[in-house]
């Protein structure tokens, strides 16, 4: 077990023990790299990697919808519970309910930027029938400038990388490229991921790649993107009927060293004192998965995550996405479902994402000829 804040060189050596979780090169790549193969030899047919094969849904339509609503509503509930302890040192205070307050003096049930950005993402899918980069960037700008999709009509709690990206979009439009530096690997794109997972729930490969695209609007650092991909894969499993053990089991995935170590499940052996809850995306994802793993219901997962403090709203929002996808709205405390702001609107958006979800991955048809 290793500290994920260890130096890169040490982590690169350490992660070799999980080489069995890295995908093998495709047959097409192996052929291109084989110097014994003639240049004019017939190309290997394109085939989808096994590790990107989707999980068959084992839920009834009603159960699947319950989990889809749970993923998006769970994000908002986690955000609303966690904001009470946002920016506080761990254990200075504790929370055992949805009580509001915190640095922004919110009413009980109100949430922060995590949910606002997720609602902008959901609106993009619903209005366009797909993810559209410019539509999403402009939705975020309307939130940033005018408070659209904010619980109190104004933008607050926006992260530095997100602000920098939106200012870049306003200056340069589609030509803006930024936030690639490792120092910008904040959690701003993972905390809003649920709409992508719901809309693309029928296809693991679509969830995997579209989590990259939605992240790239504000966060392009490798670890920010890679952590989105890992959570997207886990949400795909949960939304299609997996239980906690299957969802959080190590799996073959193409990941950088720190996300790979999280994928391998080392957080399952860590104590609370070994878990960080900062806004660094690696810390946020590890803390969220630790909270889900060490609980057996939605309520306890949210409180475990929120009481880690520091970036408590984002850790709890990330945990809430996965716990909501595992336990559904039916597994949430009814008083939280009722109290969280915009509850019915959020559930309605989740239903629209669910109903409009494509049955096939268009990229599969392009790459592998599948219809």
Swiss-Prot record:
Q: Which Gene3D superfamilies match?
A: ADP-ribosylation/Crystallin J1 (1.10.4080.10)
Keyword annotations: Hydrolase, Magnesium, Metal-binding
Note whether Metal-binding occurs among the keywords. yes
Residue positions annotated to bind Mg(2+) are 112-114, 157, 313
UniProt GO molecular function: ADP-ribosylarginine hydrolase activity; metal ion binding
Q: How is the cofactor bound?
A: Binds 1 Mg(2+) ion per subunit.
Q: Briefly, what is this protein's role?
A: Immunity component of an interbacterial competition system (also called effector-immunity systems). Expression in E.coli neutralizes the toxic effects of non-cognate S.proteamaculans effector protein Tre1 (Tre1-Sp); cannot be co-purified with Tre1-Sp from E.coli, suggesting they do not form a stable complex. Probably acts as an arginine mono-ADP-ribosylhydrolase, mediating the removal of mono-ADP-ribose attached to arginine residues on proteins.
Record comment regarding domains: The N-terminal extension probably forms a projection that reaches into the active site of cognate toxin Tre1-Pp where it occludes the active site.
Q: What is this protein called?
A: ADP-ribosylarginine hydrolase Tri1
């Amino acid at each position: 077990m290793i500290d994920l804040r260890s130096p890169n060189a040490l982590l690169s050596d350490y992660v070799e023990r999980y080489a069995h979780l890295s995908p093998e090169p495709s047959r097409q790549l192996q052929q291109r790299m084989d110097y014994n193969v003639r240049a004019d030899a017939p190309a290997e047919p394109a085939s989808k990697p096994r590790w990107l094969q989707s999980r068959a849904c084992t839920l009834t339509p009603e159960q699947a919808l319950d989990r889809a609503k749970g993923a998006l509503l769970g994000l908002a509930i986690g955000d609303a519970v966690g904001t009470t302890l946002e920016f506080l040192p761990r254990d200075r205070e504790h929370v055992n309910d949805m009580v509001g307050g915190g640095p922004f003096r919110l009413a009980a049930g109100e949430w922060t930027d995590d949910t606002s950005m997720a609602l902008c993402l959901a609106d993009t899918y619903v209005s366009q029938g797909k993810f559209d980069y410019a539509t999403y960037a402009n939705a975020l700008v309307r939130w940033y400038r005018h408070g659209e999709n904010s619980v109190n009509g104004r933008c607050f709690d926006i992260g530095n990388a997100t602000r920098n990206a939106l200012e870049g979009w306003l200056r340069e439009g589609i030509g803006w490229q930024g936030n690639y530096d490792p120092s910008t690997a904040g959690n701003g794109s993972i905390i809003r991921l649920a709409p992508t997972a719901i809309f693309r729930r029928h296809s693991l490969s679509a969830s995997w790649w579209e989590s990259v695209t939605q992240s790239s609007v504000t966060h392009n650092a490798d670890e920010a993107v890679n952590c989105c991909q890992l959570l997207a894969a886990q949400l795909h499993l949960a939304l299609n009927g997996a239980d906690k053990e299957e969802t959080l089991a190590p799996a073959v995935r193409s990941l950088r060293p720190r996300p790979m170590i999280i994928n391998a499940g080392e957080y399952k052996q860590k104590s609370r004192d070994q878990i960080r809850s900062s806004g660094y995306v690696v810390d946020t994802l590890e803390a969220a998965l630790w909270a889900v793993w060490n609980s057996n219901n939605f309520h306890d997962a949210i409180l475990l995550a929120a009481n880690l403090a520091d970036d408590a709203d984002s850790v709890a929002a990330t945990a809430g996405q996965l716990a909501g996808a595992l336990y559904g709205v039916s597994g949430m405390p009814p008083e939280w479902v009722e109290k969280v702001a915009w509850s019915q609107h959020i559930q309605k958006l989740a239903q629209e994402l669910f109903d409009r979800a494509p049955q096939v991955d268009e990229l599969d048809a392009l790459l592998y000829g599948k219809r």
